[in-house]
Amino acid sequence: LNYDPLTRYIRRGTWFISESTDMELAYILTKADMPGFQTIGVNSHVFTNAGATIVQEMAFALAIGAEYLDKLTDTDLSIDEILPKMRFNVAVGQNYFMEMAKMRAYRILWANIAKAYGAKEENAKMLIHAFNAQINMSLYDSYVNMLRTTTGSMSAILGGVHSFSVTPFDMVYEPSTEFAERIARNQQLILKEESHFDKVADPAAGSYYIENLTDSLVKAAWDLFLQIQEEGGYLAALRKGTIQKMVKENAAKRLNNVATRREIILGTNQFPNFTETMKSNPEAWVFEANSRRDENAEIDTIETYRVAQQFEQLRYATDVYSQNNKRPVAWMLTYGNLAMLKARANFASNFFACAGFEVVDNAGFKTVEDGIAAAKEVKPEIVVICSSDEEYGEGNALKIYEALKDKAIVVLAGNPEGTADVLKAAGMEYFIHVKSNVLETLQDFQKKLGITK
C-alpha cells in the first residue's frame, strides 16, 4: 500500500489530514489483518532524486523508519508486528559498486535499529523494493538510459534487494511507450533468465573493495542518522530545516559539477550525438524541477529534478531556434601541431555540440592565412582556434582574432599562459578549456546569437 505520510511531509509540507490522524491511520493499516502486505512505506527515492548523497539518503530513510517505529511502538503494537509491515522503496543510480554497497549497508543498519527495539532476528531483515533513479536520466540520446537502467538494476540485485522494477527509458519525458516498457521487462528477464542473477545470495560477500565500501557507508550513514536523532528525530530535523538544507546544498553542488563536467552525463554534457535534433515538442515539465509543495506548507520542502535538465533546455532552445533560422555553426580553425590541433578540435567539438550547434571540423590548414581565408568564405557564427600553446604564442592567434573578430565570435581552445593575456587585452572574450563552466559559457553564446529559451 506504501502509506508514507512522513515522506509526503517533506515533499508537500503538509499532512494528508493532520499529524495525529495520519499516524493513527498508520496504526490502523499496520494492525489490519493483511498477511503478505507491506502497508507502511519509506520512500527514500525522494531524497535520491532531489540530489542527496547516498549517505544522506540512507540516514534520512533510516530516520523516517525509526520515526515510524517510535510512534507505532507507543501503541499496543509490538515491534515484531510492525517490522513485517514496512517496506523501503529505494532508487538506484549509476555508481555501480557504491549502489551495490548501499543496499548491503541499508540492511546492516536497519537490522541494528530493529534489534535495538527488541525485534526477533527473522523480523530484523529490511524489505527493499528498488527501481532506477530518474535524476541521471536524459532526454537527448535517450537510448543511453537503457544502459543506465541496466547497470543500476545489476547493482541493486547484487546488493540483495527483494524486488526490482526497471524504469522505462523514456519515462522521464513522456508517457512510456509500448516499446520502452517491453525493453524494461526484457532487461529484468535477461538478468534473471540468462544471467542468473537470482541464483546466488550476496555474491559481493568477501570482495575487499565492496566490503570496504559497505563498511564506509555503514559508518558515515550511522553518524548522520545519530546526528538527526540528536536533533529530536526526523520530524524535529525537518521543522528546523536541517534535512532540507543538506539536500539542497548537495543538489546545488551536483548541478555545478555537471555544468563544469566534473560529473559526466553521457550524451548530454559530454559526447553528445552531433546529428540528433528534437523533432517532437516536449512539455514544459520535462525541463523543470518537480515541486509538490502545497500553498499552505508548514515547512520548507524539497524538489526532485534531473541533472541533465539545464543542458537539455539549452540544446532544445537551439533546436527551436533552428526551425526558422540557420542553425549556428561552430567552425574549427585548425593549424600547426597535428596532435594538439586534433585534441583541441575534439574537445571544442564536444563542447559546442552540447548546445546543439552544428560543428564543422577541419583536417588542419597549412597556414594561418589559409584558415582565415576559409573562415571568411564559410561565414560561420563561431570560429574556434585550435592548435598548440606554442603556436598560439607566435602571434598567430592574435592575427586570426584581428582578422575575424568583426565576422564571427572568435574562441580559443585552451588558456595558454601569457598568450591569453595578450588576446584578452586585444578584446577576445572566450577561452574554452577543462576548467570552463560549460553551461554558463554556452548560455552566453546563445545570448550573443539571439537564441532564447
Model-derived segments and their meaning:
Residues 1-91, 129, 163, 167, ...:
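Catalytic alpha/beta active-site cores
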Residues 4-8, 43-49, 82-93, 125-135, ...:
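A glycine-rich phosphate-binding loop feature that marks nucleotide/adenosyl-phosphate handling sites
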Residues 36-69, 147-225:
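Mobile "lid/hinge" segments at catalytic clefts and subdomain interfaces of large enzymes
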Residues 52-58, 93-105, 133-146, 174-184, ...:
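Short glycine/threonine-rich loop-to-helix capping motif typified by GTGT followed
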Residues 57-136, 140-144, 226:
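Gly/Pro-rich turn-and-neighbor structural signature
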Residues 74-85, 116-126, 194-204, 230-241, ...:
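Flexible, glycine/charged-enriched surface loops at secondary-structure junctions
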Residues 162, 223-328:
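Intrinsic disorder at enzyme termini
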Residues 284-360, 373, 420, 424-426, ...:
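ATP-dependent carboxylate/acyl-activation modules
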